[in-house]
Swiss-Prot record:
GO cellular component entries: virus tail
Assigned keywords, A-Z: Viral tail protein, Virion
Name recorded for this polypeptide: Anchor protein
Stored InterPro entries: Phage_T7_tail_fibre-like_N (IPR005604)
Keyword Chloroplast attached: no
Record's keyword annotation contains Cell inner membrane: no
Predominant cellular place of this UniProt entry's protein: virion
Function statement: Anchors indirectly the receptor binding (RBP) protein (depolymerase) to the virion.
Pfam families membership: Phage_T7_tail
Subcellular location: Virion
Amino acid sequence: MAFSWQEQIKPAGTQDIQCDIEYLDKSYIHVYLDGAETTGYTWTSATNIRLNTALAASTTVLLIRKTEREYLYIEFASGSPFIEVNVDSQNTQFLHLAQELVEGRAIPGFYGTISMNGYRITDLANPINAQDAATKAYVDTADTLLGQRIDAEHSGWVSAVHAEAVTRKAADDALSMRTSALENTFISGVETVSYPWSAVLTAATDEVTPGLAFTKAVVEINGVGQIRGYSFEIVDNTILFAEVLPAGTVVAARLGADVTAGDGFATQASVDYLANSLGDLAYLDKAAAVSDATSTGDVVAKLNALLAALRTSGVLAT
């Protein structure tokens, strides 16, 4: 039980406060509302304080006794009679000062912000509640743990960045290789896009739809290259063949790859097909029946002329 102070939480609308603290003079009682001292009140009796304005909200009301310590409440030297009541009052002043000192209310600022005036608070226990004071050892330990956590998270971040960089590099390298392969589709180095696709026909048909958007392709039937405009055509993302292909036929295509390039360029597919055809021609001993198609003219025109000669000689059936 405290002798020099009392604290209560009062609800909104409260105006009268009961003072249960013993005092020698009403001026020794100080009133604090939520930590701020107020003088907006009057005494209606020896134990009741009435606020000038009722509390607008729930408020912590603190009453503190601050007994005068700079002069004696009773001064016999000034003529106060040396009687029982005066002696008791004088001793009561000493008692109240001792209570306030022991309870800490005699220390200026104890009920508010505390100033240690440059001195330390020593022999503190470790904090438990959120508003407890922390010791240097506690703070240093927490700082060390925080540093370790930061280092660990940084290390993890560095590892993650490195792993992502490795993954990205692998993807970039793969993309670079694929891009180079696609660029090399043409002898001239003209870029194109090529998607390999193949299927084994489950039923006889004269058309296949790969399911991709394309307007050009290099097509093979059972490993034999086909000529666009002769043995197949492309319409609405579908390969249309000149004749019905039986079930079991293997159809392979590089979708998006040019069969002819024009403007003096030939595709790798065209050259490969030409080489295969010339090999067939020599094997069939029909080279003499094929006109010489080499000159400085347009490559595509000469290639078409050569293909026409191959068909005439019987090397090509279509």
